[in-house]
Amino acid sequence: MRLYRDRAVVLRQHKLGEADRIVSLLTREHGLVRAVAKGVRRTRSKFGARLEPFAHIDVQLHPGRNLDIVTQVQAIDAFASDIVSDYGRYTCACAMLETAERIAGEERAPVPALHRLTVAALRAVADGTRPRELVLDAYLLRAMGVAGWAPALIECARCAAPGPHRAFHVAAGGSVCVHCRPSGSVTPPQGVLDLMAALYDGDWEHAQISTPAHRSQASGLVAAHLQWHLERQLRTLPLVERPGRAEVARNIRQDMAHGNQAEEQLPPAASGA
């Protein structure tokens, strides 16, 4: 089979034998690709450093029976170094990469919108012009949109009644009206849902004037919604330092599990986003 080229983000890698690595790539035209990079662990490797996680590359691959083989790599962006040099940026970017791999799904199923979104989000985290926690939540919301899981934030998720609506239920699909509200719904302040809508729409002017409490509660809802659809916990999300989010997500899961009949108020968030 012929060689092929594509643009890719390096999602992760692990050792293979004494000198090789297997790399997971989110490519623009070929979706999720796993490939062997031969000899990259040797000090004289031609492109070992270019295949580190977060790298945005132009890669040439040779199709293989089980795994493709990396034959050439050129760096496109140099934002990986800015990410790994700061712990906060690093943890946010790790959560993005794990989410991208989960949403990409099957290998070789092209999702060009997810590739573009991931590159733009990593670049935004690296340059630091916007709060990295907001960039992460915007990425998670839009990635869910790519997958078809975006939460309803204005109209009712069940009957499409015009909103805004105060109640929010993860399993129901987001905001729900008073007639459709299931037991276990939470009632965040309207500013929390407004913030989530601003992040999804790219309205940074309004997103960046949000309060720390609203940011904390919004991140809890975003994380709970994403992990409910993935049907698994993301290993990297707990590493992101955002006070209050874990408590919010835990309370939401408990409300859903116990089927509380009364509306539940979100707990007050700790100071700081």
From Swiss-Prot:
Keywords: DNA damage, DNA recombination, DNA repair. One of its GO terms (biological process) is DNA recombination. One of its GO terms (cellular component) is bacterial nucleoid. The keyword Kinase does not apply. It comes from the Bacteria. It holds the Pfam family RecO_N. PANTHER family: DNA REPAIR PROTEIN RECO. Belongs to the RecO family. Involved in DNA repair and RecF pathway recombination. This is DNA repair protein RecO. The lineage of its organism: Bacteria, Bacillati, Actinomycetota, Actinomycetes, Mycobacteriales.
